[in-house]
Amino acid sequence: MNLCAGPFDRTLERCEENEGNELLQPDLNRMNNLRRVAVIDCGTNTFNLRVVDVGASAGWIPVFGQRIPVRLGQGGVAKGVIRPDRMARGLDALVAMREALRNYRVEEVHVLATSAMRDAKNGHEFVAQAKGLAGFDIQIISGQHEARLIQEGILLNFQEPPAETCLTMDIGGGSVEFVVWDRDGIKWAQSFDTGVARLQMLMGLPDPVGQEGVAKMRPYFDDVMAPLAAAMEALKPTLLVGASGSFDTIADLVGTRIRTERPDHAQSPEPHPSIDPVPLTDWEEVARQLIECDVHHRTAMPGMDPARVDLMPFSAGLIQWVLDQGTVTRMCRAPYALREGVLSRLERGLPLLPEL
């Protein structure tokens, strides 16, 4: 457990912007058996921060959130390095998050890093500099741990586990995590180095990618993700559950995203948001535009996230390959993922990482 330390000793100071309201909250938390925790997910594309108050039986109360695009893997993820400019960008993001956390009395800070950092030859250098500059102890997690934490997060978006067999898919910049599961638990899980930033660098495709570009990706997917194809053939998942950034954008593009995420500064625990349906017929039209249209057209698409506009054609290619395996009949987007999986474990008093 990474306790708040070093530069965070100053979180007890009054912040002029917040007039101390959030600073006083932990005193109330102690009376209510709550504790304030922060989780930072250092992804290949984006660093995400969530601050919540958690309790053994009370669920969690959202306090603060921050999302900073960093493109940590840009220009280096396929070579196994973090470029100096990307390292500086990532460190700046962590320092900014440290400054944001000075507004709150955070009792625990957990910082997890995924594909770009676990594959980079100089990942240890980033970890050391993050400790010196921001006071964070970064824990680099395996792809298997990442997949299981994502799964624990998305389960919170289901009021009841579905009766059918499901396939969770989390598209990251460096890797893509898959979990086949049903109401009895996880049947199969694996992480593949087919993230969209990695694909963009490896494939060298023009803009627009076009159907020719998708055809070029398919043999690579057939080779690298052969274990997934075998698992899908054997286990026959029918519901594709998409998590994280690419699927957030897809739900916005399709227009089905239900914005029920709980606001910051809520006063009490509220129900977790539910999944958003993504009709396959609507997805097919969105996918066509992502693949066949250039960056200017994609940028103008209602719901497009500008930070992902160059990567979404590769997300579309990945999803289309999964659908082409022939078992999936429905698709949805889950609002939660890795960070919420970590929070779920903290709330239940479990070790940060699940057993494999």
Q: What annotation goes with each model-predicted range?
A:
Residues 14, 23-26:
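Cationic, low-complexity basic patches in intrinsically disordered or flexible, solvent-exposed regions
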Residues 34-37, 51, 75-106, 116-165, ...:
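Helical "lid/coupling" subdomains associated with nucleotide-phosphate turnover
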Residues 35-61:
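N-terminal basic/disordered segments at the start of proteins
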Residues 57-71, 75-76:
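Conserved ATP-binding subdomain of kinase catalytic cores across diverse folds
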Residues 167-175, 179:
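A generic, well-ordered mixed alpha/beta core segment in the N-terminal half of proteins
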